[in-house]
């Protein structure tokens, strides 16, 4: 039998902007659009877009969700000023429509069946492709972009961040309720989003060329349109020249958003310097990365994770303290060490999920939980 020689598939390079200033920062938050009295979700994104300055608010999949995002910022001070101003302005826009905004990983008592899909081709195509999986994606996340000045370095940083996704999730978990009931999860957002394809802890890439070839293979196969259809917890973002961290629930208190962003920025700096020094990353089984993520989603800071270098079970809180202490020097270099005080507060007073549960346990009233979320979102 003769085999037919085949030409290798041609792969077009993925255009990128990994060439600017390192450690620039961008923060994105997905927020709820609410009735100001009942705190129920309202399908009002078009009203908000009409009333807000162009570009200040962006739509998401559902009409009851909006996104705000900072510009690429030189440092945490600039990012904090922008994010605070954005929350204030969006809240004022909402108030003018007898609406309010709130920030958490899920709405405690909303039903996805009541939400309308935004009339944009990308979202209609997403519903057509994913059906129920996309229709029930009524969740709210926070994304942090950190600038990287070299494409191979971006891959190294993204690979190195994978092991830390569970700790970041434990710190940020802020969604213990879903469809008017406690779920027993610290981050209910996580299993809801897990139903999507191309999600969760990503694969490890050898270098930028390996990433390019694998992305282009999927595009040529017709399964994705471009790399933005990979919704992994951490990913290179070639268009922006950043590494993007996507694992975290939206934070109710803006100080926690900024503290977590400062922590991420410091972690990226550590890994970028690791690359510059020619050091290699330790390799751990993907199954254990994924297991740790599940444990963080289930228990938040109250459980244990597997410390992968030692294979020992260690409290999530202890691992988070260890990470935080190691990042202080990097955050100091970046002018962001004061923002880490908010991460300390998460560790000492509890994350958003724990705080929601405390409010709920007083009267078992989820509207009280939402009232607390709305008030704290604007504090």
Named regions from a protein language model:
Residues 137-139, 152, 238-242:
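Coil-to-beta-strand transition motifs
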Residues 98-115, 178-183:
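Short, glycine/charge-rich beta-strand/loop segments that flank catalytic centers
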């Amino acid at each position: 039998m003769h085999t037919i020689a085949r030409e290798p598939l041609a792969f077009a390079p993925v255009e990128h902007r990994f060439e600017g200033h390192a450690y620039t920062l961008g923060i994105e938050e997905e927020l709820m659009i609410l009735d100001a009295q009942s705190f129920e979700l309202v399908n009002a994104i078009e009203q908000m877009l009409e009333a807000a300055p162009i570009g200040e608010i962006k739509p998401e999949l559902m009409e009851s969700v909006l996104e705000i995002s900072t510009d690429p910022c030189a440092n945490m001070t600039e990012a904090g000023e922008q994010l605070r101003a954005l929350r204030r302005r969006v809240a004022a826009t909402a108030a003018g429509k007898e609406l309010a905004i709130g920030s958490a990983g899920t709405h405690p008592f909303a039903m996805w069946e009541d939400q309308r899909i935004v009339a944009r081709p990308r979202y209609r195509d997403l519903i057509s492709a994913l059906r129920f999986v996309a229709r029930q994606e009524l969740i709210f996340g926070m994304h942090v972009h950190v600038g990287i000045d070299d494409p191979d370095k971006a891959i190294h940083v993204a690979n190195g961040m994978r092991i830390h996704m569970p700790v970041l999730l434990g710190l940020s978990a802020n969604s213990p309720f879903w469809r008017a009931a406690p779920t027993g999860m610290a981050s209910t957002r996580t299993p809801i989003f897990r139903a999507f394809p191309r999600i969760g802890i990503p694969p490890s890439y050898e270098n930028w060329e390996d990433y390019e070839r694998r992305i282009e293979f999927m595009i040529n196969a017709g399964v994705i349109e471009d790399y933005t259809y990979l919704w992994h917890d951490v990913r290179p973002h070639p268009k922006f020249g950043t590494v993007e961290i996507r694992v975290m629930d939206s934070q109710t208190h803006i100080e926690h958003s900024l503290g977590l962003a400062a922590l991420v920025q410091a972690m990226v700096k550590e890994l970028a310097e690791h690359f510059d020094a020619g050091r290699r990353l330790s390799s751990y089984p993907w199954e254990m990365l994924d297991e740790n993520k599940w444990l963080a989603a289930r228990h938040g800071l109250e459980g244990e994770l597997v410390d992968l270098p030692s294979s020992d079970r260690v409290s999530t809180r202890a691992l988070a303290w260890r990470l935080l202490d190691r990042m202080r020097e990097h955050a100091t270099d970046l002018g962001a060490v004061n923002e880490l005080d908010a991460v300390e507060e998460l560790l000492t007073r509890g994350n958003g999920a724990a705080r929601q549960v405390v409010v709920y346990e007083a009267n078992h009233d989820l509207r009280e939980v939402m009232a607390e979320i709305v008030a704290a979102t604007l504090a």
